[in-house]
C-alpha cells in the first residue's frame, strides 16, 4: 500500500507537526550505512553534493562528537544528533557554533521534549508521532472482485 506513507505525513501536518522530508528531492539524509559505504562523513557529503546538486539540504546523522566535527567541516547543512546524551548535545551545539542547523533525534518523549528544546537545537524529530499513534482498523477491498 504505497500511498500510506503520504497519509501518515498528512496526518502529522494536520496535527501541527512538520515532516522531515516529504519526498527524496527535499534533501539528502546521510545515515550510518551511507557513511560506511562512502568511507567517511566527508566523502559521503562530497558525493551527495556531486551526485545530487539539485537537493535543498544535506543532512548528516551523527552518533559522536568526532562525527559532529567532520560533518561541520564537510559542509553539512543540518547535523542530526542521534541518541546523544544531553551533555553530548550541548558540546555538539558548541562545536557546530551556528555553522549548520541542528536536529536532535532518538529517545524523544513528551516528558523530555521541553528540556531538549531548551538546549538550542533547531529541530527535534520524534518517530513517536507515527509509530506510537493509535491504529485505526480499516479494510481495503476491491469491490469488483466480490
What are the residue ranges of the model-derived segments?
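Nucleotide-binding motor/catalytic cores of P-loop/tubulin-like NTPases across gene-expression machines
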Residues: 85-89
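Short, charged, intrinsically disordered terminal tails
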Residues: 128-146
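Cys/His-rich Zn2+-binding cysteine-cluster or related metal-binding knuckle/ribbon modules and their
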Residues: 110
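Short secondary-structure boundary segments
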Residues: 83, 106, 127-128
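Acidic/glycine-rich phosphate/pyrophosphate-binding loops and surrounding catalytic core
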Residues: 1, 5-74, 78, 90-95, ...
Amino acid at each position: 500500500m504505497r500511498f500510506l506513507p503520504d497519509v501518515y505525513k498528512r496526518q502529522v501536518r494536520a496535527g501541527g507537526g512538520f515532516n522531515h522530508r516529504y519526498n527524496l528531492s527535499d534533501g539528502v539524509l546521510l545515515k550510518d550505512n551511507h557513511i560506511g559505504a562512502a568511507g567517511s562523513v566527508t566523502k559521503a557529503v562530497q558525493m551527495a553534493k556531486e551526485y545530487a546538486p539539485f537537493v535543498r539540504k544535506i543532512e548528516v546523522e551523527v552518533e559522536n562528537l568526532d562525527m559532529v566535527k567532520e560533518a561541520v567541516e564537510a559542509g553539512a547543512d543540518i547535523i542530526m544528533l542521534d541518541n546523544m546524551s544531553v551533555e553530548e548535545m550541548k558540546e555538539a551545539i558548541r562545536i557546530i557554533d551556528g555553522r549548520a542547523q541542528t536536529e536532535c533525534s532518538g529517545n524523544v518523549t513528551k516528558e523530555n521534549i521541553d528540556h531538549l528544546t531548551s538546549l538550542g537545537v533547531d529541530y527535534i524529530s520524534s518517530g513517536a508521532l507515527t509509530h506510537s499513534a493509535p491504529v485505526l482498523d480499516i479494510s481495503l477491498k476491491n469491490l469488483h472482485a466480490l
